[in-house]
């Protein structure tokens, strides 16, 4: 039985390793991702904002053994491999571990660089058409292509001069030196602000936020990582209620205390000014608020990503042509094994209603791998069907 994972980021790679650990042979696995190497987007984005440590603890990584990264850090003798009481792993160490595991499981041999143009069921198999017109036939598909497809650029910045989203394809490193203004309220904006401060000895950086700083250790309360909260959540029948809980429990636009304290230090030294005024417009190199017009050199946006989950052509095609079921809240109606259609599985945001507030981060990938593990065992026990 052949498995294809669409998306070679952290979650797709986590699931791929789980399948290989379960005994899936190398020639029965394909990973489709547009980047040249697996997990490249995460690595690129982390470097763009100079994030020294991950937000999640050291037990959250791509290998099935929760202590694998900790053991790796010890063997590799990383100095300052973790930070703080929650043992947040050093980003470079984390990525070193990722690359080691990708190499160990020969996942680069499974990687096809490209985009999926179409996905359809034909003669009992899934048929995947890529942007180069290559067609892949596979028995099982896992959608793990993430939620970071299109950076969110608020309307007032759409036509403004010298404005770029930090995660946009048009971004280049020369923009750091020209930028004194950052827009955003979360962890990416905080890291980016600190990067700009550290790149200059005297430049004053302006951080524009649309709310007070929200200090949270993690993306959501750790109770959502286990039965403490998830048992009740999974007993709720209403998809609308589940979605409401997820939106309430996710700490969107927040940052851990240590980041806040680093920002505070620069406020006190005069290197950082935080603005909480509502920005009315941006034009002629000026930021207009109700009180003032402040000139800017270059603005870097750290405003997150657009909610494009269900807008992807591949997803729309499955809904229209394969009758893929949706819940009342509009998200895929999936099983406890994250199965949307026969032998088509979800991870990340598409599995929100099963995985809860942590669905979209590293731990969500680990939980998705565990759910799909059960499906793999079930399908492997079935008689092999011959296709026409």
Protein language model regions, located:
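Flavin (primarily FAD) cofactor-binding/catalytic cores of flavoenzymes
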Residues: 1-35, 83-187, 191-388
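Coupling/switch segment of ABC-type P-loop NTPase heads
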Residues: 48-88
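Conserved N-terminal glycine-rich FAD pyrophosphate-binding loop of Rossmann-like flavoproteins
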Residues: 35-62, 215-230
